[in-house]
Each structure stands twice: as structure tokens, then as C-alpha cells.
Amino acid sequence: KIAILGNLLPLWDDPLWLAEQIAMMDMISGGRIVSGWVRGGGRESVSHNSNPTINWDRYQEAHDFVVKAWTTPGPFRWEGKYLHYRYVNPWALPYQKPHPPIWIPGAASRATVKWASEHRYPYVMIGGDLALTRISFDYYKEVASENGYQSSTQHVGKLVKVHVEDTDEKGDQVGRKYLSGVSNPFLDGNEGIVNLSIQNLPGLSPRGGNARMPVAASLAAGRGGVGRQSYEAQVQHYSIISAGPKKVIAGMRHVLEYLRPGSMFFWDGDGSMTHDDQMRSLRLMGQEVLPAIREVGKELGLVGPYEVPGEVTGTYLPK
């Protein structure tokens, strides 16, 4: 599969173009595309001169429009609050029917978890430690129950920074490169720490005690968060797993046992890692780690969306 996690829906002035691009990739690849939708953070809003106060509303309308463009024979007209098309008749339609699978990455926003669960879209936690991720998954399950279905492993996924080396010592040495790298205008120094005043623009996210998961809210209040923790702390919390194959497999087993996600995503080759660092890890990942993790998943009874009939594309269609 080719998972795009994900496109920044609220920032597209012409989401019809986006719908056709993804449809074309789905045709060319023979139905391999997984389409992820994200809202983006404050940095993206600043870069694209986008109003953060309407980000969430634009996200939802753009999503409904793209799904309709994929599933409704044209021509049709769309007159929404933010999007206006007199004539919609896509020349490219997805290979997969009714549309490519939609997965929703998120980082502790209650609104995003709730919305994903209401639409029965798999939710992929891309930030936060294991405790915060479990709280998010439990909330997804709670919302699913309120909407008439029981969520399971196929509805949740987790992104973890994973790097593999021949030895644990080498893994520890290279893994520290996650916390360094080239600077950019939106980071404090060159240690990859997001400037909170840019990331959390006024109006971008709902305010109040229920806007974020409890652990995330407490971290934000203390200017904490995984990105501001030391390397040792992130390793302790399983936000980074960087070691030899056996230790990486053991760490991933703990993650799988604790969270029970049906899908896992590995974040490698970041920070100041070199091309050689990435290629060594990629080789060991494919030869030793992934086969072992798949067996652990089978042992724990973890299934992904593609292993459950009817769960691939979800059940949502726009009205």
C-alpha cells in the first residue's frame, strides 16, 4: 500500500484538484492508495496565509466535497460555506470503490478522535507517549459505541520513531540524531523543538478543558510534550526505539501489547541521520524486525483494516 498521511485539507483552495490527483495515483498504482487527511498545525497556516479560526470547518467541508467528487457521478454543483463550484465533473476517478481508504492521523485532539470514530475511519496516533495514546484509543472506542458499532484493533494505529542498527550501542548513538538537525524559522535553535506560539495559533484548536486529551492538556500547560523531552525520556516512554534488532523487537512487543493497534507506522531517517544510517536501518528492518513484529501481531490477535471485511473504505458517504 501507499499511505499518504496526510494531505492538509483546510489549506487547499481547490480540493477538486486534490481529489483528481489522488484518484489518478490510485489508478496508476492499481488501487494501492490510502488517503490520510490532516488539519495541519500553526506552521502550515502561517506558511499558507490561512485563517486558523476556520481551519476545522474548512477541513470538514473539504472532506465531504472530496468524497462526493470520488463517489457521485458528475456533473453536479457544490455551494458550501467555503467552497463554491458551479460545475464538478471529475475526469479522474479512483480505482478503489467506493473510494480509497481514508485514515485520520492525529495528535491528542479530542475533536479529531471523535470525528474519526463517528466516520468509522481508522485513527493513527502520530504524537504522544503510550499513556496518551491509550487514552485517545479508549475515547475512540467510547464514541464508536455511541454510534452503534464496536471498535477494535483495525480502527487504530500508532506511529513510533524506530531505528535499527547492528548493535544496541550503535542504535543508541544514531538514535540521538532524532533530536538534532537543520534549523528552520519555526524552530527554537536547531534541536527540532516546535515554537509553541507558532504551532498553537489562536483559533486553530478549541479552547477549554475538553479540547485535548487529559495528559496532552497537562503537558501543554507545562510547555512539555514528547518533542521537548530528552532522548532518554523519549526512549523510556517508547516514543523512540533505537537499538539492535532484538531490543527493537522487544520494545515493539511492549507497544503492541499495551496499545493493541492494528496498524503500525515507523518514523525513521529523521533529524541529522545520514543516508547510510537510513539504509542500514531499512535493511535490518526488512530482514529481521518486520517479520518478527508480524508474528507478534498474529500472536496477540491484532488485525488491520485490510483483514476485516467491510472495514477498508469505511461506511461514510456525504449527504
Language-model segments: residues:
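Active-site mouth loops of central-metabolism enzymes
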Residues: 5-16, 98-108, 162-165, 235-246
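Flexible loop/turn segments at secondary-structure boundaries
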Residues: 10-12, 43-44, 112, 131-133, ...
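Alpha-helix-loop-beta-strand connector modules within alpha/beta enzyme cores
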Residues: 1-4, 58, 283-297
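Short, acidic/polar
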Residues: 18-21, 106-114, 247-255
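Hydrophobic faces of well-ordered beta-strands that scaffold small-molecule active sites
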Residues: 2-6, 33-37, 102-105, 123-126, ...
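Flexible, glycine-rich active-site loops centered on histidine and acidic residues
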Residues: 9-78, 122-125, 129-131, 138, ...
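An alpha-helical appendage that flanks or caps ligand/catalytic pockets
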Residues: 53-93, 131-261, 294-319
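Conserved, mostly hydrophobic/aromatic
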Residues: 25, 66, 102, 116, ...
